C-alpha cells in the first residue's frame, strides 16, 4: 500500500529549463516613468518573487507547506471514467485527476498555501488578490485564514452577481469581498465613470487588487499566468505521473482547460518535462477566442498596465470578455510558458462554446456523478471528442484530463444553461 506522503512530491517542477527555446523575459514599456519589474518587489512576497525568476528545475517544497497539502487532501484522487467510456462506446481508457476534492473545490489552493506561507514568514498581516469565478479568491481566503492573515478579494462583477455562494464561502473564511470594478481604487473609479454597468474582467480586478495592495502596503497573491503559479501547480502533474505508474498506465493524450494557464500547466508540464504523453491539448472558450484570434506579442497581464510586459498569446489588455458562465476563463491572455509551447507546436488547442461544453458536462454528470465546474467542462468536451475519434479509429488510447474543480456552487448557472439546451430559455 503506497502512502499519501509518497505520492505527494517533495519538489515543485519548473519547466523553464526544459522549454524548446529561451522564454522571452518580462520587460518594462518604453518610456515608462516607473519600473513595473521593480514594482513586483513592492507587492509580492520575497520568496514568491525569487521563485518567479528562478531557472532552477526543481524547488524544494517547505515541510510546512507539504503538511498543509496533506491536510487539505493531497494527493487528490485519480479516477477512471469507466461509465463514460461505456456510454461513448470507446476503446480508449479515460482517467481524470480530481482537483475538486480539495476543501475549496479546485486546484487553486495548491499555490495559495505556499504564497500565504511565504507572506506570513515575512510578517505580512494582510493579503490582496482578484478572482473571476471565485475559486482563486476562495483559496486565498482559506490560505490566509490558515496563517491568521486578513484577506481582501476583488471579484469580477458578473461573477459576484452570478455566483453568490462563492462570495459567501470567501466571507465564511474571513475575507472582505468586493465586486470589481469598485470605487475603492483609482482604476476602478475610472472604469465606472466610463461605464457604470461594466461587467468587470479578470484584468480589471487584477489591476484593482495590485493598486489596493500598493496603496495600503499589503502583499498581492497571484492566481495564474505568472511562472511561479505554474511552478506550484506542478504537484498536480507529478502526482498524476506517480498514480498512473502505480496503475501500469502511460498517458497518450493529456487535456486541461485554460483561463490563464495554471491548471493546464501544473497538470501537463511534468509530463512534457519527463517526455511522457504524446499529445497535450489546451481547451478554452470560443466566446473568448484567445487561441484562434489572439496575437503572440508583449502585453500587460493586467488591464491597467501595472505589471511588467510579458510575451504571450493575448487578445489585448483592454479586451472586455463577454459574461460567460465559466468566469475563470474570462481572461485576455495565456501564460508566457504555455504561449511559447503552443507557438512551438508542442501544445495543441481547442475552443468550444457554452452549448458544447454544457452538453458534455451533462453527459459526464449522468455517467460519473460529479458536477464539474463550467471551466472544467471545456476539458470534458475535448475528452469526449477524442474518445469518439478513438472509437472511429479503433485506437486503445489512454486519455487523461484534469478536472480542475467541482461545480456545486455553480448550480444556478447549470439551471439556466439546461433551460437553454431544452429550448425553454
UniProtKB/Swiss-Prot annotation:
Modified residues (N6-(pyridoxal phosphate)lysine): 108
Keywords: Amino-acid biosynthesis, Aromatic amino acid biosynthesis, Lyase, Pyridoxal phosphate, Tryptophan biosynthesis
Pathway of action: Amino-acid biosynthesis; L-tryptophan biosynthesis; L-tryptophan from chorismate: step 5/5
Pfam families noted in UniProt: PALP
EC number per UniProt: 4.2.1.20
PROSITE patterns to which the protein is assigned, alphabetical: TRP_SYNTHASE_BETA
Reactions accelerated catalytically: (1S,2R)-1-C-(indol-3-yl)glycerol 3-phosphate + L-serine = D-glyceraldehyde 3-phosphate + L-tryptophan + H2O
Cofactor: pyridoxal 5'-phosphate
UniProt GO molecular function: L-serine hydro-lyase (adding indole, L-tryptophan-forming) activity; pyridoxal phosphate binding; tryptophan synthase activity
GO biological process: L-tryptophan biosynthetic process
Domain of life: Archaea
Role description: The beta subunit is responsible for the synthesis of L-tryptophan from indole and L-serine.
Family named by the database record: Belongs to the TrpB family.
Oligomer and partners: Tetramer of two alpha and two beta chains.
NCBIfam families: PRK12391.1, trpB_rel
Protein name as catalogued: Tryptophan synthase beta chain 1
Biological source species: Saccharolobus solfataricus (strain ATCC 35092 / DSM 1617 / JCM 11322 / P2)
Amino acid at each position: 500500500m503506497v502512502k499519501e506522503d509518497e505520492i505527494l512530491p517533495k519538489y515543485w517542477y519548473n519547466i523553464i529549463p526544459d522549454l524548446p527555446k529561451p522564454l522571452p523575459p518580462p520587460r518594462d514599456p518604453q518610456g515608462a516613468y516607473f519600473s513595473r519589474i521593480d514594482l513586483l518587489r513592492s507587492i509580492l512576497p520575497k520568496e514568491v518573487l525569487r521563485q518567479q525568476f528562478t531557472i532552477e528545475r526543481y524547488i524544494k517544497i517547505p515541510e510546512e507547506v507539504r503538511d498543509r497539502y496533506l491536510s487539505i487532501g493531497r494527493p487528490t484522487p485519480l479516477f477512471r471514467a469507466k461509465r463514460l467510456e461505456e456510454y461513448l462506446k470507446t476503446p480508449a481508457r479515460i482517467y481524470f485527476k480530481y482537483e475538486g476534492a480539495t476543501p475549496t473545490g479546485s486546484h487553486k489552493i495548491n499555490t495559495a498555501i505556499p504564497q500565504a506561507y511565504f507572506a506570513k514568514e515575512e510578517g505580512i498581516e494582510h493579503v490582496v488578490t482578484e478572482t473571476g469565478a471565485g475559486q482563486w479568491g476562495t483559496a486565498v481566503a482559506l490560505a490566509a485564514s490558515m496563517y491568521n492573515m486578513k484577506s481582501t478579494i476583488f471579484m469580477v462583477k458578473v461573477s459576484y452577481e452570478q455566483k453568490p455562494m462563492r462570495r459567501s464561502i470567501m466571507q465564511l473564511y474571513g475575507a472582505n469581498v468586493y465586486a470589481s470594478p469598485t470605487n475603492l481604487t483609482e482604476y476602478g473609479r475610472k472604469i465606472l465613470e466610463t461605464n457604470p454597468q461594466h461587467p468587470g474582467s479578470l484584468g480589471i480586478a487584477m489591476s484593482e487588487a495590485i493598486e489596493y495592495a500598493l496603496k495600503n502596503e499589503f502583499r498581492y497573491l497571484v492566481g495564474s499566468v505568472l511562472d511561479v503559479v505554474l511552478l506550484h501547480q506542478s504537484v498536480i502533474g507529478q502526482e498524476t505521473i506517480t498514480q498512473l505508474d502505480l496503475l501500469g498506465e502511460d498517458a497518450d493524450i493529456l487535456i486541461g482547460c485554460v483561463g490563464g494557464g495554471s491548471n493546464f500547466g501544473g497538470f501537463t508540464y511534468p509530463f512534457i518535462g519527463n517526455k511522457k504523453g504524446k499529445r497535450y491539448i489546451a481547451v478554452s472558450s470560443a466566446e473568448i477566442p484567445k487561441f484562434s484570434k489572439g496575437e503572440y506579442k508583449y502585453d500587460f497581464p493586467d488591464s491597467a498596465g501595472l505589471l511588467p510586459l510579458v510575451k504571450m498569446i493575448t487578445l489585448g489588455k483592454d479586451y472586455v470578455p463577454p459574461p460567460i458562465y465559466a468566469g475563470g476563463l474570462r481572461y485576455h491572455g495565456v501564460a508566457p510558458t504555455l504561449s511559447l509551447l503552443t507557438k512551438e507546436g508542442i501544445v495543441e488547442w481547442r475552443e468550444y462554446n457554452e452549448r458544447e461544453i454544457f452538453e458534455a458536462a451533462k453527459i459526464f454528470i449522468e455517467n460519473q456523478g460529479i458536477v464539474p465546474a463550467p471551466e472544467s467542462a471545456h476539458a470534458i468536451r475535448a475528452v469526449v471528442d477524442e474518445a469518439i475519434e478513438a472509437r472511429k479509429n479503433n485506437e486503445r488510447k489512454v486519455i487523461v484530463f484534469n478536472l480542475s474543480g467541482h461545480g456545486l456552487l455553480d448550480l444556478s448557472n447549470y439551471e439556466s444553461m439546461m433551460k437553454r439546451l431544452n429550448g425553454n430559455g
